[in-house]
């Protein structure tokens, strides 16, 4: 849903893409929180944010795009190592597709968390997307 207007994102907006080789460094990756074994649970909670950079947002007619993923995993990775592996694998998957769009980024995250990394048992996705009016 577009957080500015409250209207649902159309399939055309979600699939609108740009060739990955035309946009240098298209995504920013950040770890927002990393809870290590909270409340003596047997899993870690890692919150990752993916931001679209300026050139990609301009190509896709997006004002703002933050994709937040809360990952519940039984792994006990160091924060920097998880971010490095996650970023590398997401970019490798997007390179193999050749086109970067909102749907392809979400599809690549799903592939990395469930097929590449072991012991991921739940992911909660949240987003803040605003499209340009003009």
Curated annotation (Swiss-Prot):
Keywords, sorted A to Z: Host-virus interaction
Xref: Pfam families: Gemini_AL3 (PF01407)
Alphabetical GO biological process terms: viral process
Function: Increases viral DNA accumulation. Enhances infectivity and symptom expression.
Oligomeric and partner information: Homooligomer. Interacts with the replication-associated protein (REP). Interacts with host proliferating cell nuclear antigen (PCNA). Interacts with host retinoblastoma-related protein 1 (RBR1), and may thereby deregulate the host cell cycle. Oligomerization and interaction with PCNA are necessary for optimal replication enhancement.
Similarity-based family: Belongs to the geminiviridae replication enhancer protein family.
Protein name as catalogued: Replication enhancer protein
């Amino acid at each position: 849903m577009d957080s500015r207007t409250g209207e649902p994102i159309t399939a055309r907006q979600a699939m609108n893409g740009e060739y990955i080789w035309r946009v240098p460094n298209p995504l920013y990756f950040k770890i927002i929180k990393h809870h290590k074994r909270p409340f003596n649970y047997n899993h870690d909670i890692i919150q990752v944010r993916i931001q679209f950079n300026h050139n990609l947002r301009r190509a896709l007619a997006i004002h703002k795009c933050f994709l937040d993923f809360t990952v519940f995993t039984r792994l006990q990775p160091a924060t920097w190592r998880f971010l490095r592996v996650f970023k590398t694998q997401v970019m490798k998957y997007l390179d193999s597709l050749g086109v970067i769009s909102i749907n392809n980024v979400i599809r690549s995250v799903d592939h990395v968390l469930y097929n590449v990394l072991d012991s991921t048992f739940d992911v909660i996705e949240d987003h803040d997307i605003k499209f340009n009016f003009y």
